[in-house]
Amino acid sequence: MTAIDPQSLEKHTPMMRQYLTLKAQHPDMLLFYRMGDFYELFYEDAKKASELLGISLTARGKSGGDPIPMAGLPYHAVEGYLAKLVQLRVSVAICEQVGDPATSKGPVERKVVRIVTPGTLTDEALLQERQDNLLAALYQGKTGYGYATLDVASGRFVVTELANTEALEAELQRTNPAELLYSEDFSQMSLIAGMNGTRRRPEWEFDYDTCQRMLLNQFGTKDLKGFGIEDARLSLQAAGCLMQYVKDTQRTALPHINSIVRFNQSDSIVLDAATRRNLELTVNLQGGRENTLASVLDNTVTPMGSRMLQRWIHQPLRDHDIIRARQASIAELMMTGDFETLSEDLKALGDVERITARIALRNARPRDFARLRQALTLLPQLQQTLSAASAPHLKYLSQVIGVFPEEVDLLSRAVVDNPPMLIRDGGVIREGYNEELDQWRKLSEGATDYLHELEAREKEQTGISTLKVGYNRVHGYYIEVSRRESDLVPLSYQRRQTLKNTERYIIPELKEHEEKVLSSQGRALALEKQLWEQLFDLILPKLHELQDFAQASAELDVLCNFAERAESLNYHCPELSSISGIHIEAGRHPVVEQVSQSPFIANPVTLNAQRKMLIVTGPNMGGKSTYMRQVALITLMAHIGCYVPAEQAVIGPVDRIFTRIGASDDLASGRSTFMVEMTETANILHNATPNSLVLMDEIGRGTSTYDGLSLAWSAAEYLAKQLQAMTLFATHYFELTQLPEQLSNVENVHLDAVEHGDSIVFMHAVQEGAASRSYGLQVAALAGVPNCVISAAKHKLHQLESRDHDVQQNTEQQGTQQNMSFVPSAPSPAVEALQKLNPDELTPRQALDYLYNLKKLAL
């Protein structure tokens, strides 16, 4: 059954009518329907859950004349299944029994009490500790896009306006939302086609007036001018829809969402989607998190510090004052060595940011309060270390972190040292906190002593050695006697239960005592839950200060981490200049140097007004791509305030970093490798400025030699002459090394290699001037191309070089000059085939077949 007609509900059983009514209210979610000790799913939900969770798909009789597909899972194991569904970006509505079965006529009353969606998680068991979990909303208008993100687990609410699809694509990649809301009129579906967790919302949810009222009500303000978003109409519409969705799913007040920040792309260095991917900032090209910039830089000691560091990496700043404040803090932490002491203290803070959010949502658990108490207790010690700080930013962070003596006192008096996971069974509130609770507990505990006395007395009076007093939830208190001594039981004993080897009885005195015990236990538990709820009310007035403390502690963690990384990895403080250019001495790739088995060869780079472009040549595997990437990464690191892997770095204003490195087919959009390459190139040529850093690697490979060379030459010329962007342009078209002869701001550099017999040694050192050759055949041999293919290729290369030499001599004798001086001659089809050959992708068999094809082409 794929859909339920409301008109046919009467055909179903009362229970299924209840289920179908609830399911109709949550059509795009799996409905976990509580049945005793299980959550059950029916119809399409059951089939989907069976497939996703690997649970059995069965049937539960018939309803409406059709078999009902059914799947179930134990209620006590639900968190594990929820975690798996959340990872798959599937939302779940959890339906519980809220009525009393004893008084219910028909099905027990049920209602959805919790909604779990990928973007609204707050439970630590469902969240990735060191990654933000964002809910996003997207609205398309005539002038661009409005985009809003909210981290429900922290309360961080950010909006931005984007002018075009390229900017939107970059922002989607930067934020990587767990769940994305978009309007039914959204037209650029190709941008989100591959994303999980997308939710199509009706257009009316993005109504401007409705969204504005929603935000004003949430923040308790008369207008939005104080947040700087009053003129950001599109992002305001996205934010309003997002806020309504959160209210619908959380079903509680959201006091921790108390502000909204507008992100302006002009405040940070713009990184497009290709650049974030190619530089492997937080995710590598295979989709993992190892061997990324974040994996090297992140030695933070708190989860909230780690999340902040990743946000910084994806959002390098352009404001030199903020960067210098961070640098000064790092310098002082290194000079005093305080980063080690502070890191030890910070480590014990845990994830205060998310704990505070759970308190605001009133779904914190007892251990959250215990962890908060531990964190707040450590603050005087942290402040003592910071008290001697002279760096202005460290002083500011110390002031924001503050101390919370009243909250420490409250939590110390109220919560036991090692509380249970849940409040459900009590045992959370400390003795002495509430006199009435202590009295009820003593009554309950005194009852235990009474039971021991009763057991001893009855044993003595009856002479039954096996007699003992027990308790279970079904039958309450009872007297248990072995079967062999049951004939000694007095007539006043009333049999309650017969087991295999024992008999169980009750007596009026024990029944009366049971009522007293259960009454005292019940009253104690009810009062404890009431006191527990009051704890939230007592902590929440300090919510904003606690949020600020968490934010400042996270930043202090990142700065201490930067100090540790600088000291451990031999990083140096970069100098920020107001003059355009990049000068790096002995720069190193921060990731490659950590994973390389051999010592990393440091290299310099200089880009300035007189030297805007470097044409980078050299052999494959010689290090061209590594060299270019390290320049970009050092530049990025400098703009997050981090020290850099270089002996010296002077970096001027940078507005964007572009990379056109490597490409693959975009099958989802129907674009070939060459089309992807040209699209990325077009984006660079349209948007680069004199303050942009551009990395271009092997432009023009995916087409004919003439086409590729012409495109590469023209793109390089446009970048250097018209745009004057700071550019590293790697190529195997040696004709491009003639470009410096025509443009004064272009120079050649190369990565050297040395031949030794038939082998080659890569020096990985950058030298001035152009490379003499590309060593393609030697690299092919290293890759394992069969010797017969290498020999044939050498012979063919000699023939081609001889022919080109003859053509050149004839041209010189005739005194003519080709219009395109950088094209020596028209190559044969065999040459073009060799140009397109990628030896790394050939098996021995394919290489042999290729050789035969080359022979045919040469004839």
Swiss-Prot record:
Task: Give GO MF terms, alphabetically.
Answer: ATP binding; ATP-dependent DNA damage sensor activity; damaged DNA binding; mismatched DNA binding
* Family matches, as Pfam families: MutS_I (PF01624), MutS_II (PF05188), MutS_III (PF05192), MutS_IV (PF05190), MutS_V (PF00488)
The record's keywords, sorted A to Z, are:
ATP-binding, DNA damage, DNA repair, DNA-binding, Nucleotide-binding
Domain of life, per lineage: Bacteria
Q: Where is the composition biased (Low complexity)?
A: 808-819
Q: Does the keyword ATP-binding apply?
A: yes
- What PROSITE patterns does the entry give? DNA_MISMATCH_REPAIR_2
**Segments for region (Disordered):** 803-829
Give binding positions for ATP: G618, P619, N620, M621, G622, G623, K624, S625
Question: Its GO biological process terms?
Answer: mismatch repair
A single GO CC term for this protein reads: cytosol
Record's InterPro entries? DNA_mismatch_repair_MutS, DNA_mismatch_repair_MutS-lik_N, DNA_mismatch_repair_MutS/MSH, DNA_mismatch_repair_MutS_C, DNA_mismatch_repair_MutS_clamp, DNA_mismatch_repair_MutS_core, DNA_mismatch_repair_MutS_N, DNA_mismatch_repair_MutS_sf
Q: What role does it play? A: This protein is involved in the repair of mismatches in DNA. It is possible that it carries out the mismatch recognition step. This protein has a weak ATPase activity.
Family designation: Belongs to the DNA mismatch repair MutS family.
NCBIfam families on file: mutS1, PRK05399.1
List the PANTHER family.
DNA MISMATCH REPAIR PROTEIN MSH1, MITOCHONDRIAL (PTHR11361:SF34), DNA MISMATCH REPAIR PROTEIN MUTS FAMILY MEMBER (PTHR11361)
The name this protein goes by in its record: DNA mismatch repair protein MutS
Species lineage: Bacteria, Pseudomonadati, Pseudomonadota, Gammaproteobacteria, Alteromonadales
